[in-house]
Protein backbone atom coordinates (compact mmCIF):
# COMPACT_ATOMS: atom_id res chain seq x y z
CA UNK A 1 0.00 0.00 0.00
CA UNK A 2 2.86 2.31 0.74
CA UNK A 3 4.19 1.68 -2.72
CA UNK A 4 0.77 2.49 -4.19
CA UNK A 5 0.58 5.79 -2.28
CA UNK A 6 4.02 6.81 -3.49
CA UNK A 7 3.14 5.96 -7.09
CA UNK A 8 -0.21 7.77 -6.96
CA UNK A 9 1.53 10.81 -5.52
CA UNK A 10 4.03 10.74 -8.36
CA UNK A 11 1.23 10.42 -10.91
CA UNK A 12 -0.61 13.40 -9.43
CA UNK A 13 2.55 15.52 -9.65
CA UNK A 14 3.14 14.48 -13.27
CA UNK A 15 -0.51 14.60 -14.32
CA UNK A 16 -0.15 17.92 -16.14
CA UNK A 17 2.80 16.69 -18.20
CA UNK A 18 1.09 13.47 -19.17
CA UNK A 19 -2.08 15.30 -20.16
CA UNK A 20 -0.16 17.58 -22.45
CA UNK A 21 1.20 14.58 -24.27
CA UNK A 22 -2.13 12.87 -24.76
CA UNK A 23 -3.67 13.22 -28.22
CA UNK A 24 -7.05 13.72 -26.57
CA UNK A 25 -5.91 16.82 -24.67
CA UNK A 26 -4.03 18.82 -27.26
CA UNK A 27 -4.36 22.52 -26.77
CA UNK A 28 -6.13 24.35 -29.54
CA UNK A 29 -3.23 26.74 -29.82
CA UNK A 30 -0.62 23.99 -30.04
CA UNK A 31 0.57 23.09 -33.54
CA UNK A 32 0.60 19.24 -33.86
CA UNK A 33 3.65 17.54 -35.31
CA UNK A 34 3.47 16.26 -38.87
CA UNK A 35 3.46 12.66 -37.66
CA UNK A 36 0.48 13.27 -35.37
CA UNK A 37 -1.30 15.25 -38.04
CA UNK A 38 -0.89 12.42 -40.52
CA UNK A 39 -2.00 9.98 -37.83
CA UNK A 40 -5.25 11.87 -37.34
CA UNK A 41 -5.88 12.44 -41.06
CA UNK A 42 -8.31 10.46 -43.16
CA UNK A 43 -5.45 8.90 -45.11
CA UNK A 44 -4.05 7.09 -42.07
CA UNK A 45 -6.23 5.23 -39.51
CA UNK A 46 -5.67 2.72 -36.76
CA UNK A 47 -6.50 -0.84 -37.88
CA UNK A 48 -9.84 -2.06 -36.61
CA UNK A 49 -8.43 -4.98 -34.68
CA UNK A 50 -5.97 -2.66 -32.93
CA UNK A 51 -8.87 -0.39 -31.98
CA UNK A 52 -10.67 -3.35 -30.49
CA UNK A 53 -7.55 -4.27 -28.52
CA UNK A 54 -7.27 -0.75 -27.14
CA UNK A 55 -10.96 -0.77 -26.21
CA UNK A 56 -10.57 -4.08 -24.47
CA UNK A 57 -7.54 -2.82 -22.57
CA UNK A 58 -9.49 0.23 -21.47
CA UNK A 59 -12.42 -1.84 -20.25
CA UNK A 60 -10.16 -4.30 -18.50
CA UNK A 61 -8.26 -1.53 -16.79
CA UNK A 62 -11.46 0.07 -15.51
CA UNK A 63 -12.96 -3.22 -14.42
CA UNK A 64 -9.74 -4.29 -12.82
CA UNK A 65 -9.34 -1.38 -10.37
CA UNK A 66 -8.91 -2.97 -6.93
CA UNK A 67 -9.41 -6.46 -8.38
CA UNK A 68 -6.94 -9.29 -8.62
CA UNK A 69 -8.86 -11.29 -11.25
CA UNK A 70 -6.66 -10.11 -14.09
CA UNK A 71 -3.70 -9.04 -12.06
CA UNK A 72 -4.12 -5.41 -13.21
CA UNK A 73 -3.76 -2.52 -10.82
CA UNK A 74 -5.03 0.93 -11.79
CA UNK A 75 -1.55 2.31 -11.52
CA UNK A 76 -0.20 -0.42 -13.79
CA UNK A 77 -2.89 0.34 -16.40
CA UNK A 78 -1.60 3.87 -16.65
CA UNK A 79 1.97 2.77 -17.27
CA UNK A 80 0.97 -0.10 -19.55
CA UNK A 81 -2.28 -0.98 -21.32
CA UNK A 82 -1.96 -4.64 -20.39
CA UNK A 83 0.37 -7.41 -19.49
CA UNK A 84 -0.97 -10.12 -21.83
CA UNK A 85 1.55 -9.58 -24.65
CA UNK A 86 -0.15 -6.49 -26.06
CA UNK A 87 1.49 -3.90 -23.84
CA UNK A 88 1.66 -0.50 -25.53
CA UNK A 89 3.80 2.25 -24.09
CA UNK A 90 2.03 5.53 -24.72
CA UNK A 91 5.21 7.31 -25.74
CA UNK A 92 5.96 4.63 -28.30
CA UNK A 93 2.42 4.76 -29.69
CA UNK A 94 3.12 8.16 -31.18
CA UNK A 95 5.98 6.84 -33.31
CA UNK A 96 4.49 3.38 -33.82
CA UNK A 97 0.87 2.22 -33.65
CA UNK A 98 1.73 -0.97 -31.81
CA UNK A 99 4.12 -3.82 -31.54
CA UNK A 100 1.75 -6.49 -32.89
CA UNK A 101 2.51 -6.02 -36.61
CA UNK A 102 0.66 -2.77 -37.18
CA UNK A 103 3.55 -0.36 -36.66
CA UNK A 104 3.66 2.61 -39.08
CA UNK A 105 6.82 4.75 -39.09
CA UNK A 106 6.16 8.37 -40.06
CA UNK A 107 9.71 9.73 -39.89
CA UNK A 108 10.73 8.70 -43.42
CA UNK A 109 7.36 9.71 -44.84
CA UNK A 110 7.54 13.18 -43.37
CA UNK A 111 11.10 13.50 -44.66
CA UNK A 112 10.00 12.55 -48.20
CA UNK A 113 7.18 15.06 -48.07
CA UNK A 114 9.60 17.70 -46.84
CA UNK A 115 11.96 17.02 -49.76
CA UNK A 116 9.04 17.11 -52.17
CA UNK A 117 7.95 20.50 -50.86
CA UNK A 118 11.52 21.74 -50.93
CA UNK A 119 11.66 21.13 -54.71
CA UNK A 120 8.21 22.27 -55.78
CA UNK A 121 7.38 25.01 -53.27
CA UNK A 122 9.65 27.66 -54.88
CA UNK A 123 7.95 27.16 -58.25
CA UNK A 124 4.49 27.23 -56.67
CA UNK A 125 5.36 30.39 -54.73
CA UNK A 126 6.70 32.02 -57.90
CA UNK A 127 3.52 31.25 -59.83
CA UNK A 128 1.38 32.45 -56.92
CA UNK A 129 3.26 35.74 -56.75
CA UNK A 130 2.94 36.24 -60.51
CA UNK A 131 -0.79 35.51 -60.30
CA UNK A 132 -1.33 37.85 -57.34
CA UNK A 133 0.60 40.72 -58.91
CA UNK A 134 -0.95 40.54 -62.40
CA UNK A 135 -4.41 39.20 -61.59
CA UNK A 136 -4.34 37.22 -64.83
CA UNK A 137 -6.28 33.95 -65.19
CA UNK A 138 -4.33 30.85 -64.22
CA UNK A 139 -4.14 29.54 -67.78
CA UNK A 140 -2.49 32.81 -68.89
CA UNK A 141 -0.11 32.66 -65.91
CA UNK A 142 0.97 29.11 -66.77
CA UNK A 143 1.42 29.83 -70.49
CA UNK A 144 3.30 33.13 -70.14
CA UNK A 145 5.54 31.88 -67.33
CA UNK A 146 6.49 28.92 -69.52
CA UNK A 147 7.45 31.24 -72.38
CA UNK A 148 9.44 33.49 -70.04
CA UNK A 149 11.30 30.55 -68.51
CA UNK A 150 12.19 29.02 -71.90
CA UNK A 151 13.36 32.41 -73.13
CA UNK A 152 15.72 32.62 -70.16
CA UNK A 153 17.28 29.31 -71.27
CA UNK A 154 17.84 30.56 -74.82
CA UNK A 155 21.45 31.81 -74.28
CA UNK A 156 22.43 28.34 -73.06
CA UNK A 157 20.94 26.79 -76.21
CA UNK A 158 22.82 29.21 -78.48
CA UNK A 159 26.10 28.47 -76.71
CA UNK A 160 25.48 24.74 -76.91
CA UNK A 161 24.73 24.94 -80.63
CA UNK A 162 27.95 26.80 -81.28
CA UNK A 163 29.91 24.15 -79.41
CA UNK A 164 28.21 21.24 -81.18
CA UNK A 165 28.88 22.95 -84.51
CA UNK A 166 32.57 23.01 -83.65
CA UNK A 167 32.39 19.36 -82.61
CA UNK A 168 30.88 18.42 -85.98
CA UNK A 169 33.78 20.20 -87.70
CA UNK A 170 36.42 18.27 -85.76
CA UNK A 171 34.78 14.84 -85.79
CA UNK A 172 36.00 13.78 -89.27
CA UNK A 173 39.56 14.40 -88.10
CA UNK A 174 39.23 12.30 -84.94
CA UNK A 175 39.93 8.55 -84.71
CA UNK A 176 37.15 6.03 -84.21
CA UNK A 177 35.66 5.47 -80.77
CA UNK A 178 36.27 1.74 -80.99
CA UNK A 179 39.62 0.19 -81.94
CA UNK A 180 39.80 -0.80 -85.64
CA UNK A 181 39.96 -4.49 -86.36
CA UNK A 182 43.53 -5.74 -86.23
CA UNK A 183 44.86 -2.61 -84.53
CA UNK A 184 45.82 -4.52 -81.39
CA UNK A 185 44.53 -1.71 -79.15
CA UNK A 186 42.10 -2.24 -76.32
CA UNK A 187 38.92 -0.21 -75.96
CA UNK A 188 40.46 1.77 -73.10
CA UNK A 189 43.58 2.55 -75.12
CA UNK A 190 41.45 3.64 -78.08
CA UNK A 191 39.38 5.95 -75.87
CA UNK A 192 42.57 7.45 -74.42
CA UNK A 193 43.85 8.02 -77.95
CA UNK A 194 40.54 9.62 -78.94
CA UNK A 195 40.64 11.91 -75.89
CA UNK A 196 44.23 12.92 -76.59
CA UNK A 197 43.52 13.68 -80.26
CA UNK A 198 40.42 15.65 -79.31
CA UNK A 199 42.39 17.88 -76.96
CA UNK A 200 45.28 18.30 -79.41
CA UNK A 201 43.08 19.70 -82.18
CA UNK A 202 41.01 21.85 -79.80
CA UNK A 203 37.72 19.98 -80.10
CA UNK A 204 35.23 20.96 -77.34
CA UNK A 205 34.10 18.43 -74.77
CA UNK A 206 31.38 16.02 -75.87
CA UNK A 207 29.47 16.92 -72.70
CA UNK A 208 28.22 19.95 -74.66
CA UNK A 209 26.06 17.63 -76.76
CA UNK A 210 23.63 16.69 -73.92
CA UNK A 211 24.20 19.89 -71.89
CA UNK A 212 21.13 21.89 -72.90
CA UNK A 213 18.92 18.82 -73.02
CA UNK A 214 19.92 17.87 -69.47
CA UNK A 215 19.09 21.32 -68.12
CA UNK A 216 15.85 21.62 -70.05
CA UNK A 217 14.53 18.17 -69.12
CA UNK A 218 15.31 18.73 -65.43
CA UNK A 219 13.48 22.05 -65.41
CA UNK A 220 10.64 20.54 -67.41
CA UNK A 221 9.98 17.81 -64.84
CA UNK A 222 10.27 20.27 -61.93
CA UNK A 223 7.82 22.69 -63.55
CA UNK A 224 5.28 20.08 -64.65
CA UNK A 225 5.44 18.34 -61.25
CA UNK A 226 4.82 21.62 -59.43
CA UNK A 227 1.78 22.42 -61.58
CA UNK A 228 0.52 18.86 -61.11
CA UNK A 229 0.85 19.31 -57.35
CA UNK A 230 -1.19 22.50 -57.55
CA UNK A 231 -3.86 20.73 -59.61
CA UNK A 232 -4.14 17.72 -57.31
CA UNK A 233 -4.24 19.97 -54.22
CA UNK A 234 -7.05 22.03 -55.81
CA UNK A 235 -4.98 25.18 -55.61
CA UNK A 236 -7.19 28.27 -55.17
CA UNK A 237 -8.49 29.38 -58.56
CA UNK A 238 -7.49 26.24 -60.46
CA UNK A 239 -11.08 24.94 -60.48
CA UNK A 240 -12.13 27.77 -62.79
CA UNK A 241 -8.81 29.11 -64.04
CA UNK A 242 -8.88 27.51 -67.49
CA UNK A 243 -10.45 28.47 -70.81
CA UNK A 244 -12.25 26.93 -73.78
CA UNK A 245 -12.59 23.16 -73.22
CA UNK A 246 -10.23 23.07 -70.22
CA UNK A 247 -12.09 25.30 -67.76
CA UNK A 248 -11.14 23.16 -64.74
CA UNK A 249 -7.35 22.77 -64.51
CA UNK A 250 -7.60 20.16 -61.75
CA UNK A 251 -9.45 17.60 -63.87
CA UNK A 252 -7.96 15.02 -66.22
CA UNK A 253 -9.14 15.10 -69.87
CA UNK A 254 -12.73 13.88 -70.10
CA UNK A 255 -15.87 14.26 -72.10
CA UNK A 256 -16.30 14.97 -75.78
CA UNK A 257 -13.25 17.25 -75.97
CA UNK A 258 -11.12 15.06 -73.74
CA UNK A 259 -8.84 13.73 -76.53
CA UNK A 260 -7.91 17.26 -77.69
CA UNK A 261 -5.06 17.79 -75.24
CA UNK A 262 -3.56 14.27 -75.70
CA UNK A 263 -3.75 14.62 -79.48
CA UNK A 264 -2.16 18.08 -79.26
CA UNK A 265 0.67 16.80 -77.04
CA UNK A 266 1.41 13.84 -79.32
CA UNK A 267 1.32 15.95 -82.49
CA UNK A 268 3.56 18.67 -81.09
CA UNK A 269 6.05 16.09 -79.79
CA UNK A 270 6.29 14.41 -83.20
CA UNK A 271 6.69 17.74 -85.02
CA UNK A 272 9.36 18.90 -82.59
CA UNK A 273 11.29 15.64 -83.10
CA UNK A 274 11.38 16.06 -86.88
CA UNK A 275 12.51 19.70 -86.67
CA UNK A 276 15.16 18.95 -84.05
CA UNK A 277 16.84 16.21 -86.06
CA UNK A 278 16.72 18.31 -89.21
CA UNK A 279 18.55 21.12 -87.43
CA UNK A 280 21.14 19.03 -85.60
CA UNK A 281 24.74 19.28 -86.80
CA UNK A 282 26.23 16.35 -84.92
CA UNK A 283 23.91 13.66 -86.24
CA UNK A 284 24.97 14.48 -89.83
CA UNK A 285 28.46 13.21 -89.09
CA UNK A 286 29.00 9.60 -90.11
CA UNK A 287 30.13 8.58 -86.62
CA UNK A 288 26.74 9.53 -85.15
CA UNK A 289 24.40 8.63 -88.00
CA UNK A 290 23.27 5.24 -86.72
CA UNK A 291 22.94 6.45 -83.13
CA UNK A 292 20.86 9.43 -84.23
CA UNK A 293 18.58 7.23 -86.33
CA UNK A 294 17.96 4.90 -83.40
CA UNK A 295 17.22 7.80 -81.03
CA UNK A 296 14.88 9.42 -83.54
CA UNK A 297 13.01 6.13 -83.97
CA UNK A 298 12.62 5.87 -80.20
CA UNK A 299 11.21 9.41 -79.97
CA UNK A 300 8.80 8.72 -82.83
CA UNK A 301 7.51 5.59 -81.08
CA UNK A 302 7.21 7.57 -77.86
CA UNK A 303 4.52 9.68 -79.55
CA UNK A 304 1.90 6.94 -79.06
CA UNK A 305 2.85 6.45 -75.41
CA UNK A 306 2.57 10.19 -74.70
CA UNK A 307 -0.93 10.23 -76.21
CA UNK A 308 -2.24 7.70 -73.70
CA UNK A 309 -0.19 9.13 -70.82
CA UNK A 310 -1.82 12.52 -71.31
CA UNK A 311 -5.21 11.07 -70.33
CA UNK A 312 -3.85 10.51 -66.80
CA UNK A 313 -2.56 14.05 -66.19
CA UNK A 314 -4.43 17.13 -64.93
CA UNK A 315 -5.27 19.70 -67.56
CA UNK A 316 -3.11 22.27 -65.80
CA UNK A 317 -0.03 20.13 -66.43
CA UNK A 318 -1.11 19.46 -70.02
CA UNK A 319 -1.47 23.20 -70.62
CA UNK A 320 2.13 23.71 -69.51
CA UNK A 321 3.33 20.77 -71.64
CA UNK A 322 1.57 22.00 -74.78
CA UNK A 323 2.96 25.52 -74.30
CA UNK A 324 6.47 24.15 -73.76
CA UNK A 325 6.34 22.04 -76.95
CA UNK A 326 4.90 24.92 -78.98
CA UNK A 327 7.73 27.18 -77.82
CA UNK A 328 10.29 24.52 -78.79
CA UNK A 329 8.89 24.28 -82.32
CA UNK A 330 8.82 28.07 -82.75
CA UNK A 331 12.33 28.38 -81.30
CA UNK A 332 13.77 25.72 -83.63
CA UNK A 333 12.08 27.25 -86.67
CA UNK A 334 13.43 30.73 -85.91
CA UNK A 335 16.96 29.57 -85.11
CA UNK A 336 17.06 27.50 -88.30
CA UNK A 337 16.24 30.50 -90.48
CA UNK A 338 19.34 31.34 -92.56
CA UNK A 339 19.33 35.03 -91.63
CA UNK A 340 18.91 34.38 -87.90
CA UNK A 341 21.44 31.56 -87.81
CA UNK A 342 23.97 33.71 -89.68
CA UNK A 343 23.49 36.61 -87.25
CA UNK A 344 23.96 34.32 -84.25
CA UNK A 345 26.86 32.43 -85.81
CA UNK A 346 24.89 29.18 -85.87
CA UNK A 347 25.04 28.52 -89.61
CA UNK A 348 25.91 24.88 -90.13
CA UNK A 349 29.53 24.45 -91.14
CA UNK A 350 28.75 21.92 -93.80
CA UNK A 351 28.64 24.90 -96.18
CA UNK A 352 31.92 23.58 -97.55
CA UNK A 353 30.14 20.34 -98.35
CA UNK A 354 26.55 21.31 -99.14
CA UNK A 355 26.64 24.99 -100.13
CA UNK A 356 29.46 25.04 -102.59
CA UNK A 357 27.63 27.63 -104.65
CA UNK A 358 28.73 30.25 -102.12
CA UNK A 359 32.38 29.30 -101.46
CA UNK A 360 34.56 30.66 -104.28
CA UNK A 361 38.02 29.44 -105.10
CA UNK A 362 39.82 32.75 -105.20
CA UNK A 363 43.22 31.28 -105.98
CA UNK A 364 43.40 27.53 -106.55
CA UNK A 365 47.15 27.68 -107.17
CA UNK A 366 47.66 29.10 -103.68
CA UNK A 367 45.27 26.55 -102.24
CA UNK A 368 42.81 29.07 -100.80
CA UNK A 369 39.03 29.13 -100.70
CA UNK A 370 36.47 31.43 -99.13
CA UNK A 371 34.32 30.14 -96.30
CA UNK A 372 31.18 32.33 -96.19
CA UNK A 373 30.26 31.18 -92.68
CA UNK A 374 33.49 32.75 -91.42
CA UNK A 375 32.68 36.17 -92.91
CA UNK A 376 35.23 36.12 -95.70
CA UNK A 377 38.05 34.47 -93.75
CA UNK A 378 40.22 32.36 -96.05
CA UNK A 379 40.87 28.78 -95.11
CA UNK A 380 43.31 26.40 -96.74
CA UNK A 381 41.95 23.53 -98.82
CA UNK A 382 44.86 21.49 -97.54
CA UNK A 383 43.12 21.45 -94.16
CA UNK A 384 40.03 19.81 -95.65
CA UNK A 385 39.52 16.07 -95.44
CA UNK A 386 39.36 13.97 -98.65
CA UNK A 387 35.63 13.60 -98.18
CA UNK A 388 35.16 17.37 -97.94
CA UNK A 389 37.34 17.92 -101.00
CA UNK A 390 35.31 15.41 -103.05
CA UNK A 391 32.00 16.92 -101.93
CA UNK A 392 33.20 20.40 -102.90
CA UNK A 393 34.57 19.25 -106.25
CA UNK A 394 31.31 17.45 -107.05
CA UNK A 395 29.44 20.72 -106.58
CA UNK A 396 31.80 22.53 -108.93
CA UNK A 397 31.56 19.71 -111.44
CA UNK A 398 27.76 19.78 -111.44
CA UNK A 399 27.93 23.55 -111.97
CA UNK A 400 30.20 23.15 -114.99
CA UNK A 401 33.39 24.33 -113.24
CA UNK A 402 35.57 21.40 -114.29
CA UNK A 403 38.79 23.40 -114.00
CA UNK A 404 38.09 24.04 -110.32
CA UNK A 405 36.97 20.53 -109.45
CA UNK A 406 39.91 18.57 -110.92
CA UNK A 407 42.64 20.09 -108.66
CA UNK A 408 40.53 19.36 -105.60
CA UNK A 409 40.06 15.74 -106.68
CA UNK A 410 43.78 15.29 -107.27
CA UNK A 411 44.46 16.73 -103.82
CA UNK A 412 41.96 14.31 -102.29
CA UNK A 413 43.74 11.38 -103.97
CA UNK A 414 47.08 12.65 -102.71
CA UNK A 415 45.71 12.49 -99.19
CA UNK A 416 43.99 9.14 -99.72
CA UNK A 417 45.16 7.19 -102.80
CA UNK A 418 42.57 4.48 -102.13
CA UNK A 419 39.59 6.84 -102.17
CA UNK A 420 37.49 5.17 -104.90
CA UNK A 421 34.84 7.86 -105.11
CA UNK A 422 37.51 10.48 -105.81
CA UNK A 423 38.93 8.31 -108.63
CA UNK A 424 35.54 7.91 -110.27
CA UNK A 425 34.58 11.58 -110.07
CA UNK A 426 38.02 12.58 -111.36
CA UNK A 427 37.50 10.22 -114.32
CA UNK A 428 34.12 11.80 -115.05
CA UNK A 429 35.61 15.30 -114.86
CA UNK A 430 38.45 14.37 -117.23
CA UNK A 431 35.94 12.76 -119.64
CA UNK A 432 33.96 16.00 -119.74
CA UNK A 433 37.20 17.82 -120.66
CA UNK A 434 37.70 15.30 -123.51
CA UNK A 435 40.77 13.82 -121.81
CA UNK A 436 39.52 10.29 -122.55
CA UNK A 437 42.80 8.41 -122.05
CA UNK A 438 43.44 9.77 -118.56
CA UNK A 439 39.77 9.41 -117.70
CA UNK A 440 39.81 5.73 -118.74
CA UNK A 441 42.93 5.17 -116.62
CA UNK A 442 41.29 6.55 -113.45
CA UNK A 443 38.04 4.69 -114.02
CA UNK A 444 39.70 1.37 -114.86
CA UNK A 445 41.85 1.67 -111.74
CA UNK A 446 38.75 2.22 -109.60
CA UNK A 447 36.91 -0.70 -111.23
CA UNK A 448 39.93 -2.97 -110.74
CA UNK A 449 40.17 -2.15 -107.03
CA UNK A 450 36.46 -2.82 -106.59
CA UNK A 451 36.66 -6.17 -108.39
CA UNK A 452 39.53 -7.24 -106.14
CA UNK A 453 37.29 -6.87 -103.09
CA UNK A 454 34.27 -8.72 -104.64
CA UNK A 455 31.80 -5.99 -103.66
CA UNK A 456 28.56 -7.00 -101.98
CA UNK A 457 27.51 -3.78 -100.26
CA UNK A 458 25.01 -1.58 -102.10
CA UNK A 459 27.37 1.41 -102.26
CA UNK A 460 30.29 -0.66 -103.55
CA UNK A 461 28.14 -2.32 -106.23
CA UNK A 462 26.89 1.08 -107.35
CA UNK A 463 30.46 2.42 -107.60
CA UNK A 464 31.47 -0.60 -109.70
CA UNK A 465 28.56 -0.03 -112.10
CA UNK A 466 29.39 3.66 -112.52
CA UNK A 467 33.15 3.06 -112.91
CA UNK A 468 32.62 0.31 -115.52
CA UNK A 469 30.07 2.36 -117.43
CA UNK A 470 32.28 5.44 -117.73
CA UNK A 471 35.40 3.37 -118.40
CA UNK A 472 33.58 1.71 -121.29
CA UNK A 473 32.45 5.00 -122.80
CA UNK A 474 35.93 6.53 -122.38
CA UNK A 475 37.54 3.64 -124.29
CA UNK A 476 34.93 3.75 -127.05
CA UNK A 477 35.52 7.48 -127.52
CA UNK A 478 39.21 6.68 -128.04
CA UNK A 479 38.32 4.12 -130.71
CA UNK A 480 39.02 1.17 -128.38
CA UNK A 481 35.61 -0.36 -128.94
CA UNK A 482 36.45 -3.90 -127.80
CA UNK A 483 37.93 -2.65 -124.50
CA UNK A 484 34.90 -0.42 -124.00
CA UNK A 485 32.46 -3.26 -124.67
CA UNK A 486 34.33 -5.42 -122.16
CA UNK A 487 33.68 -2.90 -119.39
CA UNK A 488 30.03 -2.45 -120.36
CA UNK A 489 29.52 -6.20 -120.68
CA UNK A 490 30.69 -6.58 -117.08
CA UNK A 491 27.69 -4.55 -115.98
CA UNK A 492 25.31 -6.43 -118.28
CA UNK A 493 26.35 -9.73 -116.69
CA UNK A 494 25.75 -8.44 -113.17
CA UNK A 495 22.62 -9.24 -111.22
CA UNK A 496 20.08 -6.46 -111.48
CA UNK A 497 20.39 -4.44 -108.25
CA UNK A 498 17.41 -3.74 -106.01
CA UNK A 499 18.56 -0.31 -104.88
CA UNK A 500 16.73 2.36 -106.99
CA UNK A 501 19.84 4.48 -107.49
CA UNK A 502 22.00 1.51 -108.49
CA UNK A 503 19.26 0.21 -110.77
CA UNK A 504 19.13 3.55 -112.62
CA UNK A 505 22.90 3.39 -113.24
CA UNK A 506 22.56 -0.26 -114.24
CA UNK A 507 19.89 0.51 -116.87
CA UNK A 508 21.97 3.38 -118.28
CA UNK A 509 24.88 0.98 -118.72
CA UNK A 510 22.60 -1.50 -120.54
CA UNK A 511 21.55 1.22 -122.99
CA UNK A 512 25.19 2.05 -123.74
CA UNK A 513 26.07 -1.63 -124.06
CA UNK A 514 23.15 -2.23 -126.45
CA UNK A 515 24.20 0.71 -128.59
CA UNK A 516 27.83 -0.50 -128.70
CA UNK A 517 27.08 -4.13 -129.63
CA UNK A 518 24.47 -3.08 -132.19
CA UNK A 519 27.13 -1.07 -133.98
CA UNK A 520 29.16 -4.28 -134.00
CA UNK A 521 26.30 -6.10 -135.79
CA UNK A 522 24.87 -7.91 -132.76
CA UNK A 523 21.35 -6.61 -133.37
CA UNK A 524 19.33 -9.37 -131.67
CA UNK A 525 21.46 -9.29 -128.54
CA UNK A 526 21.16 -5.51 -128.40
CA UNK A 527 17.36 -5.76 -128.69
CA UNK A 528 17.30 -8.30 -125.82
CA UNK A 529 18.99 -5.89 -123.44
CA UNK A 530 16.92 -2.95 -124.61
CA UNK A 531 13.72 -4.88 -123.80
CA UNK A 532 14.92 -5.15 -120.20
CA UNK A 533 15.47 -1.40 -120.16
CA UNK A 534 12.08 -0.59 -121.69
CA UNK A 535 10.36 -2.68 -119.02
CA UNK A 536 11.42 -0.02 -116.50
CA UNK A 537 11.78 3.05 -118.72
CA UNK A 538 9.37 3.19 -121.70
CA UNK A 539 11.15 6.29 -123.03
CA UNK A 540 13.60 3.94 -124.81
CA UNK A 541 10.77 2.21 -126.74
CA UNK A 542 11.58 4.13 -129.90
CA UNK A 543 15.22 3.06 -129.71
CA UNK A 544 14.12 -0.57 -129.29
CA UNK A 545 11.78 -0.29 -132.26
CA UNK A 546 14.58 1.04 -134.46
CA UNK A 547 16.86 -1.73 -133.24
CA UNK A 548 14.33 -4.40 -134.17
CA UNK A 549 13.42 -2.95 -137.57
CA UNK A 550 16.53 -1.22 -138.94
CA UNK A 551 20.01 -2.44 -139.68
CA UNK A 552 21.56 0.68 -138.17
CA UNK A 553 20.87 2.88 -135.21
CA UNK A 554 20.94 6.57 -135.96
CA UNK A 555 23.89 8.33 -134.49
CA UNK A 556 21.60 10.82 -132.77
CA UNK A 557 19.97 8.02 -130.80
CA UNK A 558 23.30 6.83 -129.49
CA UNK A 559 24.27 10.37 -128.64
CA UNK A 560 21.01 10.89 -126.78
CA UNK A 561 21.49 7.73 -124.75
CA UNK A 562 25.04 8.74 -123.89
CA UNK A 563 23.88 12.21 -122.95
CA UNK A 564 21.14 10.79 -120.74
CA UNK A 565 23.62 8.58 -118.97
CA UNK A 566 25.88 11.54 -118.27
UniProtKB/Swiss-Prot annotation:
Comp. bias intervals (Low complexity): 555-566
UniProt-annotated location(s): Mitochondrion inner membrane
Superkingdom to which the source organism belongs: Eukaryota
InterPro entries given in the database record: TPR-like_helical_dom_sf, TPR_rpt, YidC/ALB3/OXA1/COX18
GO MF, any single term: membrane insertase activity
Region (Disordered) location: 547-566
Extent of the signal sequence: none
Residues annotated as transit peptide in the record: 1-44
Alphabetical UniProt keywords: Membrane, Mitochondrion, Mitochondrion inner membrane, Repeat, TPR repeat, Transit peptide, Transmembrane, Transmembrane helix
Pfam families: TPR_8
Family annotation (Gene3D superfamilies): Tetratricopeptide repeat domain
Membrane topology: Multi-pass membrane protein
GO cellular component term, pick one: mitochondrion
Coiled coil recorded as keyword: no
GO terms classed as biological process: mitochondrial cytochrome c oxidase assembly; protein insertion into membrane; protein insertion into mitochondrial inner membrane from matrix
TPR repeat ranges per the UniProt record: 386-419, 420-453, 465-498, 507-540
Residue ranges of the TM segments: 139-159, 207-227, 249-269, 301-321
PROSITE patterns per UniProt: TPR_REGION
Entry's family note: Belongs to the OXA1/ALB3/YidC (TC 2.A.9.2) family.
Role of this protein: Probably required for the insertion of integral membrane proteins into the mitochondrial inner membrane.
PANTHER family tied to this protein: CYTOCHROME C OXIDASE ASSEMBLY PROTEIN COX18, MITOCHONDRIAL, OXA1
Protein name: ALBINO3-like protein 3, mitochondrial
Naturally occurring in which organism (per UniProt): Arabidopsis thaliana (Mouse-ear cress)
Name of the coding gene: ALB3L3
Amino acid sequence: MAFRRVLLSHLRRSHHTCSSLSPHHVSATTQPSIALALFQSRFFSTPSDLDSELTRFRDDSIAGVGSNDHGLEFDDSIASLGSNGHGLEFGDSIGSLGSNGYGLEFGDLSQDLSNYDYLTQPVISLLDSYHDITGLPWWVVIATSTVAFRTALLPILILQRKQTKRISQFLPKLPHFWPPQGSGRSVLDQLKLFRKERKDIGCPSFLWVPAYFSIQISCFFLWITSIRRMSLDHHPGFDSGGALWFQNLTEIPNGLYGPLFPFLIAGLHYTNTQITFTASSVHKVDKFTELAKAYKTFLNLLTCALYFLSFQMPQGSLLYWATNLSFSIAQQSILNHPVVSAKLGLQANDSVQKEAGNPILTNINEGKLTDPSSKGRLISVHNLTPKELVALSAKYLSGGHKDKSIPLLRLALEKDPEYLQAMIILGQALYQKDQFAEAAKCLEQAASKLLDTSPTEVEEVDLLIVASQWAGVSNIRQGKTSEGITHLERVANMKEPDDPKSKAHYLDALVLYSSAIFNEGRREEAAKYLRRVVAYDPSFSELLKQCEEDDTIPTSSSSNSTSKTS
